[in-house]
């Protein structure tokens, strides 16, 4: 019988152990308590320590011995895991003892999360000027208020300001901005009977809160219907005067749309453009850009002043003054080139010069033409010639501007500058004194320049203009076949002139223009003049 009862007993024990397996495990964990609580809380919280398994049975039935291993189920399913039986249950959000917020009797807040309760409402250091103007816009009461909390606020007619109240009294009420959101305080703060639910903002509020905060936020400025219409209109008047009153003195003192008369005048704007007005001419060379002094041709305003006062000599009339030209640009170029010709260092080769250079034109026509054509060339020089634009623009690199500071020799009469003294003397004789010290021995013609005499001597086939009696040996065989011994000349003063003439014929001499260059230029201009 024992053998028959043993399987039944084992089966009953297996069934019983299967039913109470979780309870046995709970009993083992209940006896062995943890060394430290899972959620450590301050001693002043006035709450019980958390129970590890709040869902377990109150009375546990102990078992005699663990069940046999062979009768345990192969698969163990923890059916109570969803009920959080192995974890401490979530503490309830109650106002009596909560582990989430600060305790009720703890006065100092560690982290003031809400600026409404930071104690800055009655701060003395705030200036009264900023309080009166900005309290209706930037208020501590309207910072973190919930947007649509269902709060019913009782009206207090005694707190409504009248027309006689000042803006500082209005700032003490701390009216928030006129937004649809109600006051930030819930009823759980103002009343002590509401303990049935937990307000999240109550978790950070100390128990002994400031009593002056509660009446400040029971406001009547949100437009409730309980207030009388007269009091509501009086409050709206004060608010409108505080927030949106702009004095007319400030508006008139700041003329935002007044016309700016500083930019109406064109003179002020033209001063900004003046440095860029000077445009150089197209025919300008590099030497004219670098040249300094009052004769610079960089800008057009150089021609605006009187040239007689500046250069101290009468400026020759340009060729454009003789004939009217319709093209304005062409007239400007001719005027510039005519002024350049009046200041050039070599005025000898200009056939289109003015009346004060007629003597030089006569010299060129005489030395470039044979003797029978003297009357024709002098008649051409007396009559005003037609304007020739081509010779005025033909200017070599040697004929640079006369206002170069490197030219140290200055003429006393016309202020022209030259690099060498012989150039200054040649200019002085040809233009000012009309002195002609050079004379041809065959025809007796006189010249003011030695290169003109050398050019004229080539017209004679015999070459008698060159005096060759410097050598003492008068043997005709010593001369070349084309050279004939000249007759003896008693005037030895002409020897220096002859030496100067020979030196001028040498290509590398001190003269600026050699005889060949002078002859080529003379031939070209003589062809154009005819």
Curated annotation (Swiss-Prot):
Q: Does this entry carry the keyword Transcription? A: yes
Gene Ontology molecular function, alphabetical: DNA-binding transcription factor activity, RNA polymerase II-specific; RNA polymerase II cis-regulatory region sequence-specific DNA binding; zinc ion binding
Q: What ranges of residues constitute the C2H2-type zinc fingers?
A: 409-432, 438-460
Q: So which residues are the signal peptide here?
A: none
Q: List the InterPro entries hit by this protein, alphabetically.
A: VerF-like, Znf_C2H2_sf, Znf_C2H2_type
**Which cysteine pairs are joined by S-S bonds?**
none
Gene3D superfamilies on file: Classic Zinc Finger (3.30.160.60)
Subcellular location(s) of the protein: Nucleus; Cytoplasm
Q: Which GO terms describe its cellular component?
A: chromatin; nucleus
- Please give the SUPFAM superfamilies that the UniProt record associates with this protein: beta-beta-alpha zinc fingers
Q: What happens when the gene is disrupted?
A: Shows remarkable defects in conidial yield (40% decrease) and virulence (25% decrease). Decreases tolerances to hyperosmolarity, oxidation, carbendazim, cell wall perturbing and high temperature at 34 degrees Celsius. Significantly reduces the resistance of conidia to oxidation, hyperosmolarity, wet-heat stress at 45 degrees Celsius and UV-B irradiation. Leads the repression of conidiation- and virulence-associated genes and affects also expression of stress-responsive effector genes and cellular signaling factors.
| Keyword set, alphabetical order | Cytoplasm, Metal-binding, Nucleus, Repeat, Transcription, Transcription regulation, Virulence, Zinc, Zinc-finger
Task: Extract the Pfam families matched here.
Answer: zf-C2H2 (PF00096)
Predominant location: nucleus
| PANTHER family in UniProt | MIP31509P (PTHR40626), RESPIRATION FACTOR 2-RELATED (PTHR40626:SF13)
Task: Tell me, in a sentence or two, what this protein's role is.
Answer: Transcription factor that acts as a key downstream transcription factor in the HOG1-MAPK pathway. Plays crucial roles in the regulation of conidiation, virulence and multi-stress responses. In addition to regulating the expression of genes specifically involved in stress-response, conidiation and virulence, controls also expression of cellular signaling factors.
Q: What is this protein called?
A: C2H2-type transcription factor MSN2
């Amino acid at each position: 019988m024992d053998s028959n009862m043993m399987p039944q007993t084992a089966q009953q024990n297996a069934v019983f152990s299967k039913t109470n397996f979780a309870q046995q495990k709970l009993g083992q964990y209940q006896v062995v308590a943890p060394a430290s609580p899972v959620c450590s809380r301050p001693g002043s919280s006035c709450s019980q320590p958390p129970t590890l398994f709040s869902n377990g049975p109150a009375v546990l039935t102990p078992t005699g011995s663990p069940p046999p291993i062979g009768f345990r189920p192969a698969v163990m399913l923890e059916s109570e895991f969803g009920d959080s039986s192995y974890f401490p249950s979530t503490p309830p959000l109650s106002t009596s003892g909560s582990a989430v917020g600060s305790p009720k009797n703890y006065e100092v807040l560690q982290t003031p999360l809400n600026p409404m309760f930071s104690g800055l409402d009655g701060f003395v250091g705030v200036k009264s000027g900023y309080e009166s103007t900005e309290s209706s816009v930037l208020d501590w009461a309207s910072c973190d208020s919930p947007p649509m909390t269902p709060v019913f606020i009782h009206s207090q007619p005694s707190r409504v300001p009248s027309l006689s109240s000042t803006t500082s009294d209005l700032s003490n009420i701390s009216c928030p901005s006129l937004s649809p959101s109600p006051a930030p305080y819930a009823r759980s703060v103002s009343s002590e009977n509401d303990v049935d639910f937990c307000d999240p903002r109550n978790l950070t509020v100390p128990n002994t809160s400031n009593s002056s905060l509660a009446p400040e936020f029971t406001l009547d400025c949100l437009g409730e219907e309980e207030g009388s219409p007269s009091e509501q209109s009086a409050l709206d008047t004060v608010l409108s005067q505080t927030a949106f009153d702009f004095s007319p003195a400030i508006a008139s003192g700041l003329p935002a749309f007044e016309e700016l008369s500083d930019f109406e005048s064109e003179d002020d704007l033209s001063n900004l453009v003046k440095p860029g007005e000077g445009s150089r001419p197209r025919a300008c060379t590099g030497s004219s850009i670098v040249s300094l002094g009052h004769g610079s041709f960089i800008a057009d305003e150089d021609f605006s002043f009187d040239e007689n006062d500046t250069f101290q000599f009468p400026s020759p009339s340009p060729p454009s003054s003789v004939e009217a030209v319709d093209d304005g640009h062409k007239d400007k170029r001719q005027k510039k080139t005519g002024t350049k010709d009046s200041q050039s260092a070599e005025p000898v080769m200009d056939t289109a010069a003015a009346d004060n250079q007629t003597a030089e034109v006569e010299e060129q026509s005489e030395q470039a033409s044979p003797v029978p054509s003297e009357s024709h060339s002098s008649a051409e020089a007396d009559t005003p010639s037609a304007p020739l634009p081509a010779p005025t623009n033909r200017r070599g690199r040697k004929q640079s501007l006369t206002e170069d500071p490197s030219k140290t020799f200055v003429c006393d009469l016309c202020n022209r500058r030259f690099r060498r003294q012989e150039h200054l003397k040649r200019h002085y004789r040809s233009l000012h004194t009309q002195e002609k010290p050079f004379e041809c021995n065959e025809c007796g013609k006189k010249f003011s320049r030695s290169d003109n005499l050398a050019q004229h001597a080539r017209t004679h086939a015999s070459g008698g203009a060159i005096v060759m009696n410097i050598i003492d040996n008068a043997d005709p065989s010593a001369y070349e076949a084309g050279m004939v011994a000249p007759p003896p000349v008693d005037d030895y003063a002409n020897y220096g002139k002859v030496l100067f003439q020979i030196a001028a014929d040498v290509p590398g001499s001190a003269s600026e223009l050699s005889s060949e260059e002078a002859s080529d230029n003379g031939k070209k201009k003589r062809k154009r003049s005819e």
